């Protein structure tokens, strides 16, 4: 279709009937800030694809501009020009934001002088070729307007001669011609802006401090309610798991206030954290308690509310000064350290009425069960994603930036020290720090390095360039640390600092809410440490609207951990990780944003592809973490329901027949027994059906287990009522063939004794297995797990098929789900016209070492059209080409499946049905000379989504 028809069809869908063509990419859309979509995302999408842009926004702030800085930088590098018009209306637009825009060579900025009439425009126009996209409505270029506010905007598509577009551009050009060049008015406007801001500050200083008590936030309220319930039921221990910055210390203070102990002990691992905890408790309790400190420097043994470091308290001559039941209530902070002997000694000695443990990350790689220490009583669990959704944290703008190439080599795990501290790299770090900026009057940054020597040299280099900095390590005294933090955070301090360099002493516990920029100039060690370091900037603070996180990404082998950490997805599913890298900015809650430059994305994709998650050591670690949390042996469903590693990784491992096999290898406490025949039965289901890509086989098995029989009609009814699948008798018949081993000759060979049914009745063998409780438990677990996978991952089927758009399928999956009577996957390579279907499998990036005659030029022409080559030695009159050409007459359904490269494994993304419209006879080179081949162009029924298109096209 041409663009004019696309726009007309889009208008019909938008204004006549929404079901007309809902996949049309040109339809007018209503844009607001909702879960999974922000106005910001639409603007970013258009900026990334445009040839030119025009923006008119009454108000522009640094907060609104910062999440777009990566996009503007890439536009500058590509030479894409834009015009941005703003105003001095209400003196609201931030001069710092205007200066930032002014620093970009490709953007021209003007300021309209508001005199009599207000200036309220909020419009964004993007041109790509002869197509224009406009977004007009209520959203200014401010952070909240683009991310969380209730805003109403309309997005429309127009050709150059469209009336609405011409009126809009005409108005923009008129205002532009009347506006002032920014350099002519910015100095005067900045003075006006600053004087107004100072007046506002002055008014705030005259306000009296509120005398109201502190009010618990949503996390703290839920935690206190859970804790009360545990205490009332007679429990004496509990664990609080909550993301860094959500207010764990205050939560514990409110809980202790609720309990009202006579004597109380708070245990931490650093004196500085103990002092911060005392301040928090004083804010809650006011002057009603006697607070004391027990550290190397203070010995307030007699205080009723005692805050102690573990180093001091664990000394034999210190803790024995107290009776075992001295304290009614004990809080242990950063309790994931409790596996250490010093913590064990304290926990074994004291006998409080109640003990509360607090941590952001209870999982430990050394096998210590933190949950067991607290009787598996999880009072509250708030991870990063939950905390962002609840608005408990300061919004962050994360930028994944490619680290510098030094002497033609990219920084990696083996880069020599002198290259890490070279002049070029120092200048690069400072350049990026300045460009991406910060919220507030001056920069207050933490820089995490990989080693002390690097931190020292970088700090010296920063100081030499006029950026005051200092290094803090575990070797520094408590007073040195406190002095450095004061110089960094206090605007009245002499010898103010801009940067503190460190390796790991700020990973946890220390509260520096003023931090407005975090630089990560080291490889990611683990998702936990990544979140701990990112979390240093996430505490809310007055006049801090957001924190900037700059992650300098080299060719590190652990780069795959970055999307795992940011998403909180612990499934270790490679497709989930890739998906977050593509779409993370669209799904991250609240006003936060995530951006990667193209090189960084490629490096992370390479890391994902080159890393094996099918490691038994990883399986055991994740299994133990979940076992500790639950206090029992977890089943497959437990992994899924607790958001842990996807157990399909275990089931698909070549060394595992089924989950039972894994339990026997991984857990010495597991003493149940299954026969070889029972294991074989579980293996068939685990390897072939547990993925949940079709529910039919699983429902038949479930019916056999509970009823002893099934009928086609009963399964058809179940599919209709529980899964909204209509009129699918063919798939039911296909599922019966699969379970009877008629679908696959290989299955018949591998499972010669396997039998689930006799006609529509349960087989005697299956009935006998089910009498064994262990077998029954395992088979129901794998069936229910598969059905849950289907509901959550594969139920959005398209066009009446058993296939879900953008889900991934193997060739065997496709044969089964297209209801082919036999598994032809072993001979199904590029495509096959069979059973009135034609699946096409494309590997987008082909290996260099394949033969010339198979180097097919398969590629997207655009998001709607795919250009594909048949196998060689075919002509326009060849049988299969004619079959494809006559698809309408024969009702042939053509399905397109694509994977980026062989590094992704055996599965392909399903791109939906396609229709051929152009056939060209051409040739392809081979060792025997040019061979005939046919190039066919296909229209996609549903245009490929932007993220996947960019992924295939190497735009990332």
Feature-to-residue mapping (PLM):
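Post-DEXD/H (motif II) to motif III coupling segment of the RecA-like Helicase ATP-binding lobe
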Residues: 337-397
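Acidic, glycine-rich low-complexity segments with interspersed aromatic residues
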Residues: 679-689, 694-698, 705, 800-907
């Amino acid at each position: 279709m041409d663009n004019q028809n696309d726009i007309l069809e889009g208008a019909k869908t938008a204004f006549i009937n929404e079901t007309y063509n809902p996949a049309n990419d040109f339809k007018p859309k209503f844009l607001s800030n909702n879960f999974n979509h922000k106005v910001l995302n639409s603007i970013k999408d258009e900026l990334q694809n445009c040839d030119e842009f025009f923006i008119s926004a009454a108000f522009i702030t640094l907060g609104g501009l910062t999440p777009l800085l990566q996009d503007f930088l890439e536009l500058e590098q590509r030479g894409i020009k834009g015009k941005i018009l703003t105003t001095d209306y209400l003196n609201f637009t931030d001069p710092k934001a205007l200066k930032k825009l002014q620093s970009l060579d490709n953007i021209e900025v003007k300021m309209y002088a508001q005199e009599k009439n207000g200036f309220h425009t909020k419009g964004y126009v993007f041109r790509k070729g002869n197509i224009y996209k406009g977004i007009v409505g209520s959203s200014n270029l401010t952070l909240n307007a683009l991310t969380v506010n209730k805003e109403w905007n309309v997005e429309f598509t127009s050709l150059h001669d469209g009336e609405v577009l011409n009126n809009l551009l005409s108005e923009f050009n008129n205002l532009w011609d009347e506006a002032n060049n920014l350099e002519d008015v910015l100095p005067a406007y900045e003075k006006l802006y600053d004087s107004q801001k100072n007046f506002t500050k002055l008014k705030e200083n005259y306000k009296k401090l509120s005398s109201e008590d502190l009010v618990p936030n949503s996390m703290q309220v839920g935690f206190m309610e859970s804790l009360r319930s545990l205490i009332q039921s007679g429990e004496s221990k509990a664990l609080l798991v909550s993301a860094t910055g959500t207010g764990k210390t205050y939560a514990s203070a409110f809980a202790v206030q609720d309990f009202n102990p006579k004597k109380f002990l708070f245990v931490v691992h650093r004196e500085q954290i103990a002092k911060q905890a005392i301040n928090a408790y004083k804010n809650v309790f006011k002057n009603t308690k006697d607070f004391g400190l027990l550290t190397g420097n203070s010995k307030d043994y007699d205080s009723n509310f005692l805050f102690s470091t573990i180093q001091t308290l664990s000394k034999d001559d210190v803790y024995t000064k107290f009776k075992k039941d001295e304290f009614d209530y004990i809080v242990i902070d950063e309790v994931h350290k409790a596996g250490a002997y010093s913590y064990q000694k304290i926990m074994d000695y004291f006998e409080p009425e109640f003990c509360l443990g607090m941590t952001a990350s209870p999982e430990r790689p050394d096998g210590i069960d933190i949950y067991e220490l607290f009787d598996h009583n999880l009072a509250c669990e708030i991870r990063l994603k939950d905390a962002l959704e609840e608005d408990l944290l300061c919004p962050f703008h994360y930028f994944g930036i490619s680290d510098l190439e030094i002497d033609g080599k990219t920084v990696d795990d083996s880069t020599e020290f002198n290259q890490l501290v070279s002049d070029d790299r120092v200048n690069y770090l400072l350049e990026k720090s300045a460009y991406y900026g910060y919220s507030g009057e001056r920069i207050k940054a933490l820089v995490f390095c990989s080693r002390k020597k690097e931190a020292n040299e970088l700090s010296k280099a920063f100081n030499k360039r006029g950026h005051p900095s200092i290094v803090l390590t575990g070797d520094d005294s408590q007073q040195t640390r406190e002095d450095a933090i004061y110089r960094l955070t206090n605007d009245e301090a002499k010898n103010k600092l801009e940067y503190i360099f460190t390796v790991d002493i700020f990973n946890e516990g220390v509260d520096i809410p003023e931090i407005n920029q975090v630089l990560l100039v080291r490889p990611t060690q683990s998702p936990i440490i990544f979140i701990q370091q990112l979390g240093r900037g996430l505490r809310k603070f007055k006049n801090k609207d957001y924190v900037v996180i700059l992650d300098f990404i080299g060719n590190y082998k652990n780069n795959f951990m970055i999307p795992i950490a940011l998403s909180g997805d612990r499934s270790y599913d490679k497709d989930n990780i890739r998906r977050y890298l593509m779409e993370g900015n669209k799904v991250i809650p609240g006003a936060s944003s995530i951006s990667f430059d193209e090189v960084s994305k490629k490096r992370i994709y390479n890391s994902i592809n080159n890393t094996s998650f099918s490691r038994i050591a990883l399986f055991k670690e994740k299994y133990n973490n979940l076992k500790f949390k639950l206090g029992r042996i977890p089943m497959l469903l437990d992994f899924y329901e607790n958001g842990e590693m996807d157990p399909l990784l275990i089931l698909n491992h070549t060394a595992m027949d089924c989950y039972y096999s894994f339990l026997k290898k991984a857990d010495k406490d597991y003493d149940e027994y299954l026969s070889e025949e029972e294991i074989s039965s579980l293996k068939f289901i685990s390897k072939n059906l547990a993925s949940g890509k079709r529910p039919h086989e699983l429902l038949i098995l479930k019916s056999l287990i509970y009823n002893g029989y099934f009928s086609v009609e009963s399964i058809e009814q179940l599919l209709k009522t529980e899964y909204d699948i209509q009129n699918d008798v063919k798939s039911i018949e296909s599922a019966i063939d699969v379970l009877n081993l008629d679908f696959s000759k290989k299955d018949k060979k591998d499972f010669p004794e396997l039998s689930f049914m006799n006609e529509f009745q349960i087989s005697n063998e299956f009935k006998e297995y089910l009498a064994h409780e262990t077998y029954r438990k395992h088979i129901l677990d794998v069936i229910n797990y598969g059905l849950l996978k289907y509901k959550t991952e594969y139920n959005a089927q398209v066009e009446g098929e058993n296939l879900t758009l953008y889900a991934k399928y193997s060739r065997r999956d496709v044969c089964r789900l297209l209801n082919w009577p036999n598994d032809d996957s072993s001979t199904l390579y590029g495509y096959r016209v069979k059973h009135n279907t034609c699946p096409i499998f494309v590997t987008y990036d082909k290996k260099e070492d394949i033969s010339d005659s198979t180097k097919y030029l398969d590629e997207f022409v655009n998001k709607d059209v795919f250009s594909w080559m048949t196998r060689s030695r075919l002509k326009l009159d060849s049988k299969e080409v004619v079959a494809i050409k006559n698809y309408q007459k024969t009702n042939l359904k053509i399905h397109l499946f694509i994977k980026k490269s062989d590094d992704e494994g055996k599965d392909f993304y399903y791109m939906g049905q396609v229709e051929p419209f152009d056939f060209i006879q051409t040739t392809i080179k081979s060792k025997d000379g040019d061979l005939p081949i046919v190039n066919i162009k296909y229209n996609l029924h549903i245009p490929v989504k932007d993220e996947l298109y960019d992924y295939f096209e190497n735009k990332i």
